[in-house]
Amino acid sequence: MLDLTLGVEEEFLLLDPGTLEPAAAADRFRAETDRGEVHRELAPAQIESATAVCRTLEELHHDLSGLRRALAADAAEQGYRLASVGVPPIGSAGPPPVTDSPRYRRMYETYGSIIEDQGVCGCHVHVGALDLETALVAGNHLRPWLPALLLLTTNSPFFRGGDTGYASWRTTLWSRWPAAGPPPVLTSARHYHYVVDCLLASGAVLDSGMLYWYARPSHRVPTLEVRVADAAATVDEAVLLAGLVRGLVGVALSDRPGPVRPVDDAVLRAACWCSAHHGLEGFSLDVGTGRLVPSWHLVDDLVEHVRPVLERYGDLDAVRALLAKLRENGSAARRQREVFRRHRDIGEVVEHVLVETVPDENAALPGRSISPSA
């Protein structure tokens, strides 16, 4: 089995401390911190952090915690607050102006009103190092598990001051893009390049960075990038997601991965919609049986599927502890709704999000972990 590394990109919103609405202030942030890099995104109220390459979940937890604390401190110094949430609960990160760059201006000119409300935030997990052919193999095996991964970080139930009825409204907003959603089965590098060339020729994408599939070969680094998830409410939930994604890639690239499980594109898209709508506390579509099952059943099946790889990397105890914590506390969407039910005030929901975003100084990865075997 390959020695798979991890990296995580987290997108955040900058909020005005008075109105708790998105604030167009990303251009004021420095490009690097001690823990990783910081990038500007499409909406000027967004920033994105990127960890260094990590080999263990403990290292990843440490880097993510440090990045969040550094960005929150930087935001506070400039009069803003940092929120890890899929969509802005109050106000909107759009409509334009978009971030002032030639690429983003061209996107606005080309796609028009699709740009509106695209100040949404996700958590992107990179697993590497993989060449293109290997990343495609891993992505094909991972497709059926995308609805389960989406469940883990549903974190966008409120938008423009009201409950959307979805656990992940970000998923719905993001699906407006022509090349967003579950990826197609891609059988070779030649097939991949053919699909990309067709999308470019049609104008559906301007470049390979606009392949907004839920899993894709990264266009910048030699990884498989899984981008199905909302911005994780907490560092723990981001680490849980990353551990399970690496587990899936590890199974796909093992000596006996089994054949790619065939899943019809329409069924997979419906299953992802179902996960985004009902969330972790509801019911989701099992793409194997075509039946609705309690969402936690999908997650439990996922953990059992990747258990050998989790054991190999020493991640099983940590993943089990993180899942137990999530099961006890509920998903981020549920936690936000409980705050609103108690206070009947969307501002209290945002305050809750802000508290969850920044980890305590003494935060550590739950669960006992051992070093990977040789």
Swiss-Prot record:
GO annotation, biological process: modified amino acid biosynthetic process
GO molecular function, one term: ATP binding
Reaction equations catalysed: L-cysteine + L-glutamate + ATP = gamma-L-glutamyl-L-cysteine + ADP + phosphate + H(+)
Signal peptide span: none
UniProt entry tagged with the keyword Ligase: yes
E.C. code: 6.3.2.2
Domain of life: Bacteria
InterPro entries on file: GCL_type2/YbdK_subfam, GCS2, Gln_synth/guanido_kin_cat_dom, YbdK
Presence of keyword Ribonucleoprotein: no
Alphabetical UniProt keywords: ATP-binding, Ligase, Nucleotide-binding
Family to which this protein belongs: Belongs to the glutamate--cysteine ligase type 2 family. YbdK subfamily.
Function recorded in the entry: ATP-dependent carboxylate-amine ligase which exhibits weak glutamate--cysteine ligase activity.
Protein name as annotated: Putative glutamate--cysteine ligase 2-1
Organism: Saccharopolyspora erythraea (strain ATCC 11635 / DSM 40517 / JCM 4748 / NBRC 13426 / NCIMB 8594 / NRRL 2338)
